[in-house]
């Protein structure tokens, strides 16, 4: 218990010292030249963001969703060693059916069409 209190005291004191020193140090105010973006010959006044395809975003989200589904279903073969494997297989089948219905819905709505 004494060791824990010593470590807590040291960390609290060190945190207080660092906070005090950072408060006392002068704040650096960079000039406008340092705040401007460096673009090596390009006009830095244009938009820094490129347009992002919403369809690509949807496909990426679907990929992550099905990738997570595979990661969740990987331990399923060891589910038959449980006392009640039917419950495990029931919920795994339910998840697969829900994801399949969602995929069919996206497909029928045209969300998976890459080109319009």
UniProtKB/Swiss-Prot annotation:
It is a multi-pass membrane protein. Disulfide bonds: none annotated. One of its GO terms (molecular function) is NADH dehydrogenase (ubiquinone) activity. Its EC number is 7.1.1.2. It comes from the Eukaryota. It is found in: Mitochondrion membrane. The chain crosses the membrane at residues 3-23, 56-76, 87-107. The keyword Repressor does not apply. InterPro entries: NADH_UbQ/plastoQ_OxRdtase_su3, NDAH_ubi_oxred_su3_sf. The keyword Endoplasmic reticulum does not apply. Its main location: mitochondrion. GO terms for cellular component: mitochondrial membrane; NADH dehydrogenase complex. Keywords: Electron transport, Membrane, Mitochondrion, NAD, Respiratory chain, Translocase, Transmembrane, Transmembrane helix, Transport, Ubiquinone. It catalyses: a ubiquinone + NADH + 5 H(+)(in) = a ubiquinol + NAD(+) + 4 H(+)(out). Belongs to the complex I subunit 3 family. Core subunit of the mitochondrial membrane respiratory chain NADH dehydrogenase (Complex I) that is believed to belong to the minimal assembly required for catalysis. Complex I functions in the transfer of electrons from NADH to the respiratory chain. The immediate electron acceptor for the enzyme is believed to be ubiquinone. This is NADH-ubiquinone oxidoreductase chain 3. It comes from Carassius auratus. The lineage of its organism: Eukaryota, Metazoa, Chordata, Craniata, Vertebrata.
